[in-house]
């Protein structure tokens, strides 16, 4: 599973589970799992709401990381294969 591959990548930072990168990683895993669930169960509105909440949390964390350290942000975006944030 994708989760195991990313966690093995993050094992060197195992003591730092509160870091922004680890939180974004765990949110991304939850998002991918919920997305595959919603492909099968289209009318599961509670899961859709949970997905939107997790997407918002991840978006806020990525915005914080892009402001604080742009290099770490770019590396994380490339590792997780997600798009960059839209800037206003």
Swiss-Prot record:
Matches recorded under PROSITE patterns:
RIBOSOMAL_S15
Specify the species: Arabis hirsuta
Please identify the protein, giving its name as recorded: Small ribosomal subunit protein uS15c
Q: Which GO terms describe its biological process?
A: translation
- Provide the coiled-coil residue spans: none
GO CC terms in record: chloroplast; ribonucleoprotein complex; ribosome
Matching SUPFAM superfamilies: S15/NS1 RNA-binding domain
Which InterPro entries does UniProt cross-reference here? Ribosomal_uS15, Ribosomal_uS15_bac-type, uS15_NS1_RNA-bd_sf
Please report which protein family the annotation says this sequence is part of: Belongs to the universal ribosomal protein uS15 family.
Query: What's a Pfam family in this record?
Result: Ribosomal_S15
Keyword field contains Translocase: no
Q: What does the annotation say about its assembly with partners?
A: Part of the 30S ribosomal subunit.
Which keywords are on file for this protein? Chloroplast, Plastid, Ribonucleoprotein, Ribosomal protein
Q: Which domain of life is it from?
A: Eukaryota
Any idea where this protein resides? Plastid, Chloroplast
Q: Which GO terms describe its molecular function?
A: structural constituent of ribosome
